[in-house]
């Protein structure tokens, strides 16, 4: 499990304090949305695995020529390797023909290819996978999960991405938020189904039973990729979370329940793909410069580094008990069982 380190706040701790917090909480993975050198320098020697974002604003530039991709990889990857364990480069976040990022869609695959080539030229092709992070707006049919498919009007965009990932043996990064499905459709989707607390199967899909929406969403993307020749492509859940305030269903209790259950569930996998799911929780901190209001309330921590929830963040047989002291003493790490 990992946690996304967003920086859209004017009151957040220093980069070195943040990385120290990751280490003291035994959080072994981190997602960065852009190659912030302050954060990358703080990550040196930490052994934390990183999803490094190439931001949307740079995608067109990177697509326009190999020299730009080479420069970007040298400056933001090679200069920090191997002190920083960059595992994936996410070229763009939630670029989609059906959202406000549609102007970037034609540059997505050329940018992926250029960064992939530049990483290979840098001698890091076996160490770093190149992918992109997508959201569920690309999925047309998601019910039942086995019938998952990409929207027909985005296939021109998704098919080449899936083909690229298949050919380079990289996973697709997917942002999965049961919260938004639930809050947009509470009449059809029950809160327990969204929070992993439904006592029984809610959806019967052939021989597969679904007791939570997260699995149903995840498996619908697997099915969609299979339909487009990407049956061998894995998925990394690059964001998932629940807001604690700011909108319908966004409460401290709901967020705590979702996060606690997500952390546990990520070890188990989905009906279609059992086994641990590499998952990144959004986000490390409440970020007060984000909009709309609910976007300010996704943090596991307040900007003063105080935990908002009591969670067991089980990494390498350790428990993260944030009801314990919030400094970096060993007493906040209790061994599991």
Swiss-Prot record:
Residue pairs linked by disulfide bridges in the UniProt entry: none
GO CC annotations, alphabetized: vacuole
Induction: In leaves, in response to infection, elicitor, ethylene, or wounding.
PROSITE patterns in the record: GLYCOSYL_HYDROL_F17
Pfam families from the UniProt entry: Glyco_hydro_17
Family per similarity comment: Belongs to the glycosyl hydrolase 17 family.
Protein name per Swiss-Prot or TrEMBL: Glucan endo-1,3-beta-glucosidase, basic isoform 1
Provenance organism: Solanum tuberosum (Potato)
Species classification: Eukaryota, Viridiplantae, Streptophyta, Embryophyta, Tracheophyta
């Amino acid at each position: 499990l990992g946690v996304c380190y967003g920086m859209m706040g004017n009151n957040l701790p220093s980069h070195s304090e943040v990385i120290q917090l990751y280490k003291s909480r035994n959080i072994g993975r981190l997602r960065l949305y852009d190659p912030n050198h302050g954060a990358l320098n703080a990550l040196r020697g930490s052994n934390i695995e990183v999803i490094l974002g190439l931001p949307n604003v740079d995608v067109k530039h990177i697509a326009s020529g190999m020299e730009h991709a080479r420069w970007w990889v040298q400056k933001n990857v090679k200069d920090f390797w191997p002190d920083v364990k960059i595992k994936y480069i996410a070229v763009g976040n939630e670029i989609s023909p059906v959202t406000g990022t549609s102007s970037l869609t034609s540059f997505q695959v050329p940018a992926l290819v250029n960064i992939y080539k530049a990483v290979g030229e840098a001698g890091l092709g076996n160490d770093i996978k190149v992918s992109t992070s997508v959201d569920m707006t690309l999925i047309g049919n998601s019910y039942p999960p086995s019938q998952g498919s990409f929207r027909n009007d985005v296939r021109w965009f998704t098919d080449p991405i899936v083909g690229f990932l298949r050919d380079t043996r990289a996973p697709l990064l997917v942002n999965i938020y049961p919260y938004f499905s639930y809050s947009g459709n509470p009449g059809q989707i029950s809160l327990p189904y969204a929070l992993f607390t439904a006592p029984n199967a809610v959806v019967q899909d052939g021989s597969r039973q679904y007791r939570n929406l997260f699995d149903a969403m995840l498996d619908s993307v697997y099915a969609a990729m299979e339909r487009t020749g990407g049956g061998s492509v894995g998925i990394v859940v690059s964001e998932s979370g629940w807001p604690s305030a700011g909108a319908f269903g966004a409460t401290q209790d709901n967020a705590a329940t979702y996060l606690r259950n997500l952390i546990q569930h990520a070890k188990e996998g989905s009906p279609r793909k059992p086994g641990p799911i590499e998952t990144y929780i959004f986000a490390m901190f409440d970020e007060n410069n984000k909009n709309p209001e609910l976007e300010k309330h996704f943090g596991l921590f307040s900007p003063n580094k105080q935990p908002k929830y009591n969670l067991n963040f089980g990494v390498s047989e350790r428990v993260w008990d944030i009801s314990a002291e919030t400094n970096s003493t060993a007493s906040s790490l209790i061994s599991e069982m």
